[in-house]
Swiss-Prot record:
Protein name per UniProt: ADP-L-glycero-D-manno-heptose-6-epimerase
UniProt-annotated binding residues for substrate: N168, R179, H186, F200, G201, E202, Y203, R213, Y292
Active site: Y139 (proton acceptor), K177 (proton acceptor)
Isomerase in keyword set: yes
Sequence positions that bind NADP(+): 11-12, 32-33, 39, 54, 75-79, 92, 143, 169, 177
Cofactor note: Binds 1 NADP(+) per subunit.
Record text about domains: Contains a large N-terminal NADP-binding domain, and a smaller C-terminal substrate-binding domain.
N-terminal signal peptide: none
Species this chain originates from: Burkholderia cenocepacia (strain HI2424)
Record-stated family: Belongs to the NAD(P)-dependent epimerase/dehydratase family. HldD subfamily.
InterPro entries, per database record: Epimerase_deHydtase, Heptose_epim, NAD(P)-bd_dom_sf
Amino acid sequence: MTLIVTGAAGFIGANIVKALNERGETRIIAVDNLTRADKFRNLVDCEIDDYLDKTEFVERFARGDFGKVRAVFHEGACSDTMETDGRYMMDNNFRYSRAVLDTCLAQGTQFLYASSAAIYGGSTRFVEERDVEAPLNVYGYSKFLFDQVIRRVLPSAKSQIAGFRYFNVYGPRETHKGRMASVAFHNFNQFRAEGKVKLFGEYNGYAPGEQTRDFVSVEDVTKVNLFFFDHPEKSGIFNLGTGRAQPFNDIASTVVNTLRALDNQAPLTLAQQVEQGLIEYVPFPDALRGKYQCFTQADQTKLRAAGYDAPFLTVQEGVDRYVRWLSGQV
């Protein structure tokens, strides 16, 4: 049967397409918007059956043009947390998602979709519960509102609906994201260009570089998506993070030490990296004050209860792999 991946040329979507290929799945319809044409590179090493622009997909899907569709991996969205055009964000992330959901429910198609930890905003608790959800920007609100729709629909749904609140995802195939690419990606490029990595200094009670996030490798994100794809009886909204909060210092230090290792140099401690000017702290920008999550950490209780028991990569493991991959692309 046919599989559909929206946002297929994007970061997570392309990784899902590649992972499906590795299972022998090639009857895949890739849906995206290639106005930014450089994203095509993410699909060059992938096998797909067809490509559709997102503007024509919804109508054709609702019309039944693709026959029996087993599953839709809905990864297509505007993920720019600094986007201020609320009308565009709601149309792209909320209305479009509702249209895809409605057809999946009507046709009995598995619906696996990208939600976001941005829903939690400045909360210090990260559980899939309404009372801790308070997005700080319109991107987070667009994801929040769609999750509320899912909560209302789930009790009567006859087919799978699985939403994943992605935390800070990093890994291969994110180059096109530009300023919205991961910290690991930017640290890598900055170190190669300038010989040092810059991190935010003290802010909101956190020491320089000690703001913490739940950084999760796209390898693990893909594995979780495929686990639920294999278990269509499992539905719900799930946090998708490692369950470990790690500081930005860990990302930067791992990037520096991996690049040093590739240059046959010995690893350094964080203190040594700072002392030698390999990591530099800069004042926290005014534009981000009040809009910045200083701490995120996924509560994995629901995910583990659903049966997903595989370990998640640490920053040291995942970023080391990623930096080596990036180095091979240069």
